[in-house]
UniProtKB/Swiss-Prot annotation:
InterPro entries: ATP_synth_asu-like_sf, ATP_synth_asu_C, ATP_synth_asu_C_sf, ATP_synth_F1_a_nt-bd_dom, ATP_synth_F1_asu, ATPase_a/bsu_AS, ATPase_F1/V1/A1_a/bsu_N, ATPase_F1/V1/A1_a/bsu_N_sf. It is found in: Cell membrane. The keyword Transmembrane does not apply. This is ATP synthase subunit alpha. Produces ATP from ADP in the presence of a proton gradient across the membrane. The alpha chain is a regulatory subunit. The keyword Cell membrane applies. HAMAP family: ATP_synth_alpha_bact (MF_01346). It catalyses: ATP + H2O + 4 H(+)(in) = ADP + phosphate + 5 H(+)(out).
Length: 503
């Protein structure tokens, strides 16, 4: 068999024509240490801060510490099968999560993967978890109310769309219930809600998801869950994932509410990671940049300018205090970042005043501008009246010889406290709140025994729904009080027909 030189040369020419000289260059490092959700790798000389890295087993990590000899990496997910000597490669991108309408109604983990057993989430849109907050000129002032349906908040510490309002209090004082009720009240308000659960018991989260489903709130809600059994990196990135999902809707011109429940546990997870990465500890062993941890998150909450679509992202961060100490490190940090705080007191909670909002310590720095005129008018003096009642109440314990005016103030104060109580998962529409508070401040409840106030409230709503729906509709559509003569006449008719249980 003779081999012809022409055939060989033509075959070589064919091979050269089809030769593809594209090379895939990967920068690969070697794992030198792994444990507690942390890995160290040698050889990643050009890696960028916060860059996403991939391990041999498919797990991802984020580059945190860039040192002269190695890189400190936080591992996202399980790290049991990562070994010393495994390879880790750069991806050239930062951590992203899936976003968009496909996530609404779903329960996902901080990586955007479904954990509700309802199948995969079909979306091709992603967003980086870290992004720059809108600048001063990209925002507008908060001017639209976000109704929580909770009388004590909408009247005393109103929240505007685009605001950051801290919910702070000891454990078991109703912080989560308050946030869930706010989500429930957004039904029909064209607000998309994102509930980020950080380190909450999985049984508790399950119960909350069932409540949201039962009351129809999952139709406009995304739940991001990082359970206590998850590694610390998952608890650390959960709030950033949640706000990235919200930003997608905000930049599309929609209104979004994001609840972070709670950021104390995220700070603890970040402290754990920082200590494992050998970063120097500071006050309460937190690292020096723990303020930046929360400020860069909450600054992404905004009311965008009209040029950018006018969307808004309202943040309700939750912080847990120890024995009511709001002067601890993390509480003071977050108080200074946010636009106000709602302080829940355990003494009030256990005495039966629920929601246990301490009107004296709670404040809303920008929400007042967003309050509807009708509510501003009826609730104007409510805070000072309540504060003077608390003061008088402590003096009244020492003697019974009180003048008529003081007794009247005490009687009005008791009724005010009773009016601001509210059962769980029963948000009240703002127009009904206005009518109720008008009745309180104009003396229509002065003759009603304190024990009958709750019944008076329910019967008042029923009466107005049946006989004065036009007045409620006017408050709802205009945001202003209707003709006061008509309103007073309607309240007078109802008050005279109301029978107290003492009779």
């Amino acid at each position: 068999m003779s081999i012809k030189a022409e055939e060989i040369s033509s075959l070589i020419k064919q091979q050269l024509e089809h030769y593809d000289d594209k090379l895939d260059i990967e920068e690969v490092g070697v794992v030198t240490y792994v444990g507690d959700g942390i890995a160290r790798a040698h050889g990643l000389n050009n890696v960028l801060s916060s860059e996403l890295l991939q391990f041999d087993n498919g797990a991802y990590g984020i580059a945190q510490n860039l040192e002269s000899n190695d890189v400190g990496i936080i591992i996202l997910g399980k790290f049991d099968d990562i070994r010393e000597g495994d390879r880790v490669k750069r991806t050239g991108r930062i951590m992203e999560v899936p976003v968009g309408d496909a996530l609404i109604g779903r329960v996902v983990n901080p990586l955007g993967q479904p954990v509700d057993g309802l199948g995969e989430i079909k979306t091709d849109k992603t967003r980086p978890i870290e992004s720059k907050a809108p600048g001063v000129m990209q925002r507008q002032s908060v001017n639209q109310p976000l109704q929580t349906g909770i009388k004590a908040i909408d009247a005393l510490v109103p929240i505007g769309r685009g605001q950051r309002e801290l919910v702070i209090g000891d454990r078991k004082t109703g912080k989560t219930s308050l946030a869930i009720d706010t989500i429930l009240n957004q039904k029909g308000q064209d607000v998309i809600c994102i509930y980020v659960s950080i380190g909450q018991k999985e049984s508790t989260v399950r119960a909350q998801v069932e409540t949201l489903k039962k009351l129809g709130a999952m139709d406009y809600t995304i739940v991001v869950e990082a359970g206590p059994s998850e590694p610390a990196p998952m608890l650390y990135i959960a709030p950033y994932s949640g706000i990235a999902m919200g930003e997608e809707f905000m930049y599309a011109g929609k209104d979004v509410l994001v609840v972070f429940d709670d950021l104390s546990k995220q700070a603890v997870a970040y402290r754990e990671l920082s200590l494992l990465l050998r970063r120097p500890p500071g006050r309460e062993a937190y690292p020096g940049d723990v303020f930046y941890l929360h400020s860069r998150l909450l600054e992404r909450s905004a009311k965008l300018s009209k040029e950018l679509g006018g969307g808004s992202l309202t943040a309700l961060p939750v912080i847990q205090t120890e024995a009511g100490d709001i002067s601890a490190y993390i509480p003071t940090n977050v108080i200074s970042i946010t636009d106000g705080q709602i302080f829940l007191q355990s003494d009030m909670f256990f005495s039966g005043t629920r929601p246990a909002i301490d009107a004296g310590a709670s404040v809303s720095r920008v929400g007042g501008a967003a309050q509807i005129p009708a509510m501003k008018k009826v609730a104007g003096t409510l805070r000072t009246d309540l504060a003077s009642y608390r003061e008088l109440e402590s003096f009244a314990q020492f003697g019974s010889d009180l003048d008529q005016a003081t007794q009247a103030k005490l009687a009005r104060g008791r009724r005010t406290v009773e009016v601001l109580k509210q059962p769980l998962h029963k948000p009240v529409a703002v127009e009904k709140q206005v009518v109720l508070l008008y009745a309180l401040t104009h003396g229509f409840m002065d003759a009603v025994p304190v024990d009958d106030i709750a019944r008076f409230e329910q019967e008042l709503y029923t009466d107005f729904d049946a006989n004065h729906a036009d007045l409620l509709a006017e408050i709802k559509s205009t945001g202003k009080l209707p003709d006061e003569n008509k309103l007073q006449e309607a309240l007078q008719q109802f008050a005279s027909s109301f029978s107290s249980s003492n009779k």
